[in-house]
Amino acid sequence: MMKFNVGDFMAELNKQLLATTSGKACEDNIVLSSNVRVTVLTDKMLRVEYNPDGVFTDLPSQTVWYRDFGKVEFSTKTDNDILVVETKSVIFNINNHTGSFKSAVIDGEEKTYNSSHNLKGTTRTLDGTYGPKELDEGIVSTDGVSVYDDSKTLLLNDDGTLSLREKGTKDIYVFAYGNDYINWIKDFYKITGKPPLVPRYVLGNWWSRYRAYTQKEYEDLMSEFFRRDIPLTIATVDMDWHWVDIKSKFGKQTKKEQHWNSGWTGYSWNTELFPDYKGFLTKLHDMGLKVTLNLHPADGVRSFENMYPQMAEALGIDKETEKAVEFDLTNNKYINAYFDILHHPYENEGVDFWWIDWQQGTKSKKAGLDPLWLLNHYHYLDTDREERRPLILSRYAGIGSHRYPLGFSGDTAINWSVLDFQPYFTANAANCGYTWWSHDIGGHMMGEHDDELYIRWLQMAVFLPILRLHSTSMDFLGKEPWNFSWEAEVLGTEFMRLRHKLIPYIYSMNYRTYNDGRALCEPMYYNYPEKEVAFEYKNEYMFGSELLVCPVTTKLDAKTKTAATKVWLPEGRWTNIFDGKIYKGNQEAFINSPINTIPVLAKEGAIIPMSADSGNTWECPEHLSINVYRGNNTIDFYEDDGETGKYKNGEFSISKMSVCEEGDTIKFTISGGKQLKCIPQKRIYTLEFKDVEEFDEVSVSINGIETPASYGKSFVNIEDVSVEDEITVTLTGAVAKANKPVEERVLDCLTHLNGSNMKKAFTNSRLKNCKTENDYKALVRRVKAKSFRMCLDEAIFALK
C-alpha cells in the first residue's frame, strides 16, 4: 500500500471545499445538568448530549450544520431523574443522567416515541431490486414525536476535514410536532440546511444509456430525437466515455498495477470512440443540451491516464515507478488534486456536472467515514460557483443528503413490481427531507420487453422530480420511444413533450422546495394529517401544490381496456387533466385509465404555467400557456436564469398568479414581476380555462388599461406583454364544464367493453331501468366481472 507523509494529510483543503456552518447554539438556550447538556433549538425541538466526562462539542456534524436560531423562551425543573424542559408548545422530559428522551407533552397529551411508528424515509440505493425494499428511518412519526440519533456521525472541522467523536457519548435531536409534518421537516431543514435550488435544465427529459457509443452515434441519436420533435435537456454519457478495456489497451504499461483489469475507473477520454471529445461537447451544447459524465473513482489514478504525471507529482510519487495514485479522501492533497487536475479541466471544456456512480461500499481509511458521503459533499461544494449552480447525480448517503441533489436510485429490474414501488419510494423520501430522486425510467435490466410497462413508467415519470431514461448495455434495450410499438412510440413522445412543457410549473415548485421546504412529491398526509385514510394511499402524492397524482402501476384489463387505480380524493373538486372528468372530493374511488391517461387531478383553483415554445429550449419561455381551473387560489410563479447562483443576490422574478371565482364571474390576475436578462422582453400569454365550457364576455386590462385580446370558447390570448405588466382577465357569464349525464357515462363503459354483445345488451336494458342511486348500487353489486364493476362504480358514483 502506498504511504504518504503526514504533510499530505495536514495540507489545507481548497477554500471551495469548506462548508459554511454555524454549529454553536445561543448560550441562553443551553441547560447543563450533570453529564447531560440540553439545547433548546426551537419551541418544538431539542438537542440532547451525553458525555460521561461532561465535555460537549459545538462542532457541526455530517448531518447537523446549524444550531443558533435565536433565543427561545423556556423553563426547566428537575423531578427525580427527569429534567423537565417546558416551552410555549411542548413539555419535554429527559433523563437527567443518561440524556435519554422519555416523553413530550403536546396539547396536554403525553407522547412517547416508538421507532416502529416512524414513517420511514428512504434508502441508499435500489440497486439489484425486483420490487419493494425496506426503507431507513425518517424524521417524522405517527407518534407525534421522534428522535434522530446523530451520535455515529463524524464531526465537521473548520478546515473541512472530519473527526471522530469521543467514545461513549450521545448526541440526539428530539422533535415534538404532533401531526404537523410540514413544519416538522421545515425545522429539520433549519438544523441541516435546506434543499438547494436545482438548475432549471434538470427538469426536462434526460437521455442516458449504458452503452459504448461512438461520437457519431451519440450525435446522430440526439439529432434523431430532435428530428422527431422529442425534447431533451441533458445528455448523459456512461462510463465508456473513458478507456474501459484496460488490459487489452494498456496491458504492458499497466503490468505493475494492482488494479490493471478494472476499467470502471477512468479519466482519459476513449479517443477511439470519441476522436474529438471537445468538439463532441461543443456540439451537444450547440444542440441545447447539458452534459454529464459517469464517474467510478474507487481505483484512483493509474499510470495510463493522461493526468497521471500531474497527479503523481502532486502526491509526491515518482512517475517512473508507475505506482497508482491511490483513491483516498482522507488525504487533503489527493482531494485538492482530484478536483484541480481530474475534474476542473473537463468542466472548463464542457462537462456540466458529474454522475458519481459509487458502488464500492461504506468503508474508508477513517473509521465511520462513508466515501459516498464525502464524495457527495466535496463534489457539490466544488461546483458551487456564482456562474455555475452546484449539481451532482449520486446515491443517497444518509440523513442530510438532501443538501447534495440529485439522487440516483440505482439499477433496478424492468418489471411491474419495481414500477409499483417507485411512487411511494419517491414521495416517502420527503420524510427525511430528500426531495430529488432520479430513477432509471423504464427500469435498468433483466425483466422483459413490455410496451405497456414502458408507457406507464414514462407517464409516471412526467410527474416525478426527474425524468431520466436509462437502461443497461444490451443491444435491444434502448429506451427510445421508437423502439417500442406504434402506440408506445406515440404516447411516449407525447408524454415527453408534456414533461418539457411543464418545466415552468416544476421550476416554480423547485423554488417552493428551496424557499418553503415543501417537497415536489409529497405524501398526502402532509396536507391532510388528521385524515387516517391519507396514510393508506401510499402511491398517491401531491406533485407541487396544484396536482394530485396516483400513477398506474398495474396492467390493463382485457375486458375494459383500462387499469383501475384506487384513489382517495380530499375535500373539494378534482379534475383529471387528461380527459376533463370531474370528481367529487372526500371519497375513495376507482379511476379507470385507458393506456393514454393516468390519474393526475388538478385541485379546485389549480394554476399550471407551461411553456408553449417550440424546440428543446429549457430557458424562460417567450410563450407562456397557463392552464386555469375554476376556484380561488394563488401561486408564486418563479423565474431566474436557471443555472447560476445570481438568484442569491436577488436576480429572480416572482409573479403572483391568482384565480377568483364568484358566481359566473372568473377573474385571473398576474402581478408584475421583475424584468431580467433571462426573461424575454415581450411575452405571449395564453390562458386556457380548462373547466369552462364557454363565457359571454371577456375583458383584459394591462396595468389597469383595457387592452384588446383574442379569445375562443375557453381561452384568452394576450400578446406583446412585459413580465413587469400587471394583467387582469375577467370572464363573465362563464359556464362550467360538466361531466356527461350518468346514462351516457354508463353507455361509454358498455361501448368499450370487450365481451358478448348479447350480454352487454341485457346489462344495458337493466341499467336503463335504474331510477335511483340505490337501483344502480344494487345492479352494480350483481355484476360478476370485477373490472367492469369498477368502471361502473366510477361512472355512476365517483364523478360529480
Task: Put a short name on every predicted segment.
Residues R47-E49, D53, D557-P570, Q675-E694:
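Surface-exposed beta-strand/loop patches in extracellular or lumenal glycoproteins
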Residues D81, I91, P708-T728:
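A surface-exposed beta-strand-loop module
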Residues L59-E73, W260, I317, T575-I595, ...:
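Solvent-exposed beta-strand/loop surfaces of large extracellular or lumenal domains
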Residues V38, L46-V48, V85-F92, L548-P551, ...:
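Short, well-ordered beta-strand segments enriched in hydrophobic/aromatic residues
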Residues L17-L18, S22-R47:
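N-terminal-proximal low-complexity accessory segments that begin disordered
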Residues F9-E12, Q16, L41-N80:
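A low-complexity, Ser/Thr/Gly/Pro-enriched, surface-exposed linker/loop concept
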Residues F4-K15, S22, F92, S103-N596, ...:
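Catalytic-domain carbohydrate-binding cleft regions of carbohydrate-active enzymes
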Residues G605-I705, V723, L731-K800:
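Accessory, solvent-exposed terminal regions and/or long lumenal/extracellular loops of proteins
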